[in-house]
C-alpha cells in the first residue's frame, strides 16, 4: 500500500512547473543518476534526543519526492528503540499512531515510529480466522519471537542488538534444538511453514492452527503447555509439558493457552511416542 500511495503522488505531481536545478537554487542530491534540488520543509525536536525532518525533492522534469526521517541520539538515557506488534499477536494490524497509543504505559511513552515489513492484506487460515496483518517475514518484539523467517530465503531483517545498536542482515532461526529423553532434533521454525526434517513451534499468538493441511498424514503434532508468563524467545531454554495426544494433522487446533510442536521427516520419531505429562526441552 505504501508503494501505491507513493507512485500516485509522483503521477499527480508530475504536471508541476519544471525548472532547472540552478533556477531552483539551494542544495542538490543525485539519486540513481538523476539530480534533485532539496528543500527542508520541517525540522524540529520531537522527543528526547530525537528530531524529525521533512524534505521536498524536485528534479528538472518536475518529478517530486517527499522524504521523512528521524534522527535519534541512542546515548540519551531517556530514549530507547523497541519493536512492538499491533495486536500483540501474529495477525491483526494498526496504524503507527494507534500502536504507539495502545502500547504507551506509565513510565514508557512511544512518541515516534516507522512501519516495517510487508504483511498479508487478505486471506484466512484453514480454520477460517483472518490472517490479515500477519507479517510476511520474521517478527520479534520485546524479545518474543512472533514469527521466524522462511528457511528458503535470506531476506534481510532490521534488528536492535543487546547493546542497542541497529543492524540490517539475514537472521537464521534454525540454530535451536528440541530434546526428549536425551534425543535431539533441530528446531527449524516458529509460527511459519514447517521445513522438513525438523521441529516447528506454534504459539497461542498464531492463527489457532499450524495452518498446513497439505502435510496432513506426513507430520506428527503434539499439544504442549509452557509455564505461565514464559514465552518463545531467542537464546532461551523452554520447558514444555505434553497436555494431549499426538496427531498427524498439519491444521490441528491450537487450544487457548497451549502450544503445538510439529515434526516432519526424520524428526517425527522424537515426538511420536510422547504421552500426557512427558516433558520436552527446547533451546531457541
Descriptions of predicted regions:
Residues 1-25:
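Bacterial Sec-dependent N-terminal signal peptides
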Residues 22-256:
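Zymogen propeptides
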Residues 122, 282-283:
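Residue-level recognition of conserved beta-strand edge/terminus positions
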Residues 231-233, 263, 279:
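Acidic, serine/threonine- and glycine-rich low-complexity intrinsically disordered segments
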Residues 250-268:
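Short, structured beta-strand/loop micro-motifs enriched in basic residues and often containing a Trp
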Residues 269-273:
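Short, conserved secondary-structure segments in the cores of folded domains
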Residues 274-281:
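Loop/turn positions that initiate beta-strands
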